[in-house]
Amino acid sequence: MYLEDTIAAIGTPVGEGGIGIIRVSGPDVPAIARRIVRRVNENGDFVSHRFYYGTVVDPESRDTVDEVMAVLMRAPRSFTREDVLEIQCHGGYLVTRRVLDAVLQCGARPAEPGEFTRRAFLNGRIDLVQAEAVIDVIRSKTEAALNLAQHQREGRLSERLKAVQGCLRHSLALVEAFIDFPDDEVDPASRVEIEAKAREASGRIEELLEGFDEGRVLRDGVSVLIAGKPNVGKSSLLNTLLQEKRAIVTSVPGTTRDIIEEVVNVRGLPLRMLDTAGIRETEDVVEQEGVRLTLEKIPQADLILFVLDGSRPFDDDDRMILAALAERRVIVVTNKSDLPVTLRIPGELEGVHTVAISTATGAGIDDLREAVFETFIHGRAIDSREYVALSQTRHRDALVKARGRIAVFFANLAAGNDLEILAVDLRDALDAVGEVTGETTPDDILELIFQRFCIGK
């Protein structure tokens, strides 16, 4: 990647649409704009951030390519902090390709995936946390996930990380001051200040780490597998949660043979719901394969909804399923609460969260949604504008490393080890936090991060 060249890409999805957008960034943008954008009733230089109506013309033949709106944004007042040209043309595969080709004929090169965002990062407009949040904004499936991503894109998580870095730099500056003046002893007041700032940094890191599990599930969603014997209402439960008829429901046992997957939004938490084949002993070869797939999926799920028929006794098929759920996160769902209750919950399930529902009447469904939500989001106000959380494993791992280096610092401080050793510990902690924000992130990790982006972003 060369920041001194000019890049271009189509910034809208391929296919028919109302408009297509071609983005161009780099030093040749003003020359490209003058060469291919023919403005109506306008002459002279482009005024920054003003929309112009006109046409894009082929740079060689001067034939009209399309009717467009175009805006040139002068550096540094653009997304990449470079000169940027955005051309809005008619949507469609061929016309957007022709406009892009006109730009490329003027010397621009095709952009790599995520290269516009990468330039914004390398030019200091955003840090790496904000860059990663851009793709999370695009891929968000719920309002809560979008809010979390937007908060990160706006820099709220970055502000908390800067506060951690500020504490560590404060401690490090004091330590290095005494290293520079070896004749001076570390006085008690300075030692207290060094220790206090390091503890504050550690506490701030701990607060961020505590919110990781919730941030991760908001970003990535969780897999929830509906398990149970045939005809207990698993498919009816999926349809009820979806509020549409997605799975076939009949009175014939074994109707569901394959795994059906759908996404359900529960208060902003994306649930990947898996409706599975009823688990039982069977001679049917196809049904056996469905049971095998279900048992294979159980260990991979984040949560199991173990559905029981409240109007029938707990039997051997239920017990076989219970054995497969050992050490899994489970909510017991007793369906058919509108019928006389015959089921007795076995002792092995005592203490497991149980919700009584009726898919026929809808009773208890809101209670079930709340139980699933609280399993992953422990009372936090995820819809609050103040909600900020870690959501990337990369961030969590780097902060765990930073916390570990601070712990080593305290051990060396207590042992009375040399100031140089204490300084190394604090620098290592700072470097670990810098891996999150991009200040010390290795190039190979940067490559992996920006490869996840689409071309044009």
Curated annotation (Swiss-Prot):
Entry's cofactor comment: Binds 1 potassium ion per subunit.
Keyword presence, Hydrolase: yes
GO MF, one example: metal ion binding
Span of domain TrmE-type G: 221-377
Protein's GO biological process: tRNA methylation; tRNA wobble uridine modification
Assigned GO CC terms: cytosol
Disulfide bonds: none
UniProt cross-references to NCBIfam families, sorted A to Z: mnmE_trmE_thdF, PRK05291.1-3, small_GTP
Name of protein: tRNA modification GTPase MnmE
Protein's organism: Geobacter metallireducens (strain ATCC 53774 / DSM 7210 / GS-15)
Gene responsible for this protein: mnmE
